Amino acid sequence: MTINKEGLRVDACSGDPMSIFGLWYEEVLRVKSVREPSAMVLATCDSENRPSARVVLLKRYSDAGFEFYTNLESRKAREIALNPCVSLVFDWRPIYKQVRVEGIAEFMDASESDAYFASRSRESQIGAWCSRQSMILEDRDVLLSKIELMEREYEGREIPRPKFWGGIRVVPNVIEFWMDGKHRLHDRRQYSKNIDGTWTSVYLYP
């Protein structure tokens, strides 16, 4: 596939940032060289305002926000419980585009988490049960032994969702679209959500 650096001009997009995101996301999904188009950097802060960041996978997006699933005892989930203000970054270099999101993270309903967990592969379900994410692992064999035990325990049976695993939705209040331009004259357009739910957009210097 030949990449067109001019691409979809930011100033030609609609006034709905989620529609723009959808167009860009569909574009990057078609680029075979992008191994994880759903990868996004999630930045959080602890109670002392010390930041941390990691890559998570976008599982769904809608007007309600950007959704991912994780161990709810992990560092990111603990920090979100203390401070729900987060940031996301989608870095799509092969198509010369980036999306930055600022928003409020909220824990999703159990029914939503149950439905998504049921759709996962059996191996991923077992992995969710056996991984004490971010905790110290003395030896990898310990984890593999837990997996083997659970495989035997639930052989031929449905695996329920662990209570410590679920979904988080980032409700955006700022979305910025960045696109590479010649001579570093990049396109940047920032959308900010108004109290009534509408969006106001401005252009930013590159």
Swiss-Prot record:
GO BP annotations listed: pyridoxine biosynthetic process
EC code(s) of this entry: 1.4.3.5
Binding of substrate, residues: K59, Y116, R120, S124, R184, L185, H186
Coiled coil feature spans: none
GO molecular function: FMN binding; pyridoxamine phosphate oxidase activity
Catalytic activity as recorded in UniProt: pyridoxamine 5'-phosphate + O2 + H2O = pyridoxal 5'-phosphate + H2O2 + NH4(+); pyridoxine 5'-phosphate + O2 = pyridoxal 5'-phosphate + H2O2
Function: Catalyzes the oxidation of either pyridoxine 5'-phosphate (PNP) or pyridoxamine 5'-phosphate (PMP) into pyridoxal 5'-phosphate (PLP).
Protein name: Pyridoxine/pyridoxamine 5'-phosphate oxidase
